Design a protein with these regions (language model features):
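ABC ATPase C-loop
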Residues: 85, 90-91, 364, 370
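A short, surface-exposed alpha-helical micro-motif characterized by mixed small hydrophobic
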Residues: 140-142, 419-421
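Helix-to-loop junction immediately C-terminal to a conserved catalytic motif
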Residues: 260
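The feature captures the beta-strand-to-loop junction immediately N-terminal to the Walker
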Residues: 245-247
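A short, proline-enriched helix->beta-strand linker immediately N-terminal to the Walker B motif
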Residues: 92-96, 371-375
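ABC ATPase "signature
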Residues: 155-159, 167, 437-438
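Conserved ABC ATPase "signature" region
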Residues: 51-68, 328-347
């Protein structure tokens, strides 16, 4: 574009605005919500004082946020509330086009649905156009009018959603559609299909009893404490895959860190193979525990060091635990990489993280966790940052490892549909406590608690159609 900076500033927000993926990074942490909205209004509308304040209140009302939040700072808001604030700022000058770049990726499924419902309601009310960018095809099939499928930097298919739902014309489109998990209907067949009957040893490999974790609230003089995990108890058996499901702030990732002993609990006990590890009393974690329980983190780029090769990442734990000598190291690492689908392994061993896709990086993270031949892997949201086809590939790796190695997996996710396809049993968490626990299919088909019912509904196709006439799609298009 041959435009001056002044022209671009005039164009930005007035003609087109954007809602970024990470609301936390999009908002200035040292400015209040009101100050950030006022900045846009002052620059583009010349509004100051009471005029700006009144307009800011109107914008908060549009996204269902109380006016007193104008004095709040980003760190005082939930993820869903921060994203609503970013949407309010994008609407400040009422541009005809709003670009939404992965606006719900970091949000749990219930908050995601609330945000999308509000966006569609505002579109109907205010008449703006949305360019919605996401890797979540299932989400777009619910509310988009038209859909452009991209692969390797090119659009491979562009059509109305109602036509794509009947079957795409491009093989890649059909691959994406076939990879979409659902929390409703009959469970799809495939590698992830679990046996009709699974038998596990009588004694659990992992048992958590009355686990509790409290965090000190930030601030030098703030003596308040946040109860993240409240008397949680559950058992996991050898060869079992257990899904730990809940919204943001439910305590599931805190439990992952407690089980892997990355943090110490405030109270409670963890038993491994029937042995009480007395985690509340010991600060030092035995090497044997680290070898037995490994973790796969949510962000495959953040969990890998950008300056080291894949070989270094897998070799380091082997050196630390003295499991392989120098001559055994490289062949073993190649074997691990090929075990998780990275072939040829000798080629991937020499790569750096930035030379791989998100799915490949997550496979490396899984291979690293497998390097010590652990009995338990704690997978903390391992697929939340991956697109739907890669997500299913990663789930298949865990299913394959369980089948071949009798590996035990504690699978932590906010995606109930993914948990259904992988886990034998699902534990639902809310506000640090267990709400419901049952075999996966029983919990999906017949949830007992209201919160579980909300999760199932939010993860099922057709959730948007139940919200009323405000959310109807357009039936006709004008190509002009």
């Amino acid at each position: 574009m041959a435009a001056s900076e002044a022209d671009i500033i005039n164009f930005r927000w007035k003609k087109i605005s954007i809602v970024m993926q990470s609301a936390l990074n999009a908002l200035n942490p040292v400015l209040s919500v009101g100050e950030q909205i006022h900045d846009v209004l002052k620059i583009h509308k010349g509004l100051i004082g009471s005029e700006a304040s009144n307009r800011a209140k109107e914008l908060l009302s549009l996204v269902d946020i109380e006016h007193n939040r104008l004095d709040s700072f980003p760190h005082q808001l939930s993820g869903g509330m921060k994203q609503r604030i970013v949407i309010a700022i994008a609407l400040a000058i009422m541009p005809p086009i709003i670009i939404m770049d992965e606006p719900t990726t970091a949000l749990d499924v219930i908050v995601e649905r609330e945000i999308i419902s509000k966006v569609i309601e505002l579109r109907k009310k205010l008449g703006f156009t949305i360019l919605f960018i996401t890797h979540d095809l299932n989400l777009l099939l619910e509310f988009a009018d038209r859909l452009a499928i991209m692969k390797d930097g090119e659009i491979v298919e562009l059509d109305e959603v109602k036509n794509i739902q009947k079957g795409g014309k491009h093989p890649y489109t059909n691959k994406l559609i076939g990879s979409i998990p659902s929390a409703s209907g009959v469970r799809q067949k495939g590698l992830l299909t679990k046996p009709d009957k699974l038998t596990f040893p009588k004694d659990p490999i992992l048992e958590v009893r009355d686990l509790k974790k409290m965090f000190q609230s930030p601030g030098l003089f703030n003596k308040d404490k946040l109860l993240a995990v409240d008397k949680v108890s559950f058992k996991v058996f050898k060869g079992e895959i257990v899904g730990l499901v809940g919204e943001s702030g439910s305590g599931k990732s805190t439990i992952a860190k407690l089980v892997t002993r990355l943090i110490r609990p405030s109270a409670g006990s963890i038993y491994l193979n029937g042995k009480n590890k007395k985690v509340t009393e010991s600060r030092n974690v035995p090497l044997e525990y680290r070898k037995t329980v490994q973790m796969v983190f949510q962000d495959p780029f953040g969990s890998l060091n950008s300056i080291h090769t894949v070989y270094h990442h897998l070799a380091r734990p082997l050196f630390r635990h003295k499991l392989k000598n120098q001559t055994e190291m490289f062949p073993y690492i190649v074997h691990l990489l090929e075990k998780v689908g990275l072939t040829p392994g000798n080629k991937f061993a020499k790569k750096f993280p930035h030379e791989m896709s998100g799915g490949e990086r997550q496979r490396v993270a899984i291979a690293r966790a497998l390097s010590l031949d652990p009995q338990i892997i704690v997978a903390d949201e391992p697929t939340s940052m991956l697109d739907v086809s890669i997500r299913m590939d990663v789930l298949e790796i865990f299913a394959k490892l369980r089948k071949e190695n009798n590996l035990t997996v504690l699978f932590i996710t906010h995606d109930l549909a993914s948990a259904r396809y992988l886990a034998d049993r699902i534990i639902v968490l809310k506000n640090g406590s267990i709400v419901e626990e049952n075999a996966s299919e029983k919990l999906i088909q017949n949830p007992k608690k209201e919160y579980t019912k909300q999760l199932v509904t939010a993860a099922s196709p057709g959730w948007l159609s139940s919200l009323g006439e405000n959310f109807e799609k357009k039936e006709e298009y004008n190509d002009q």
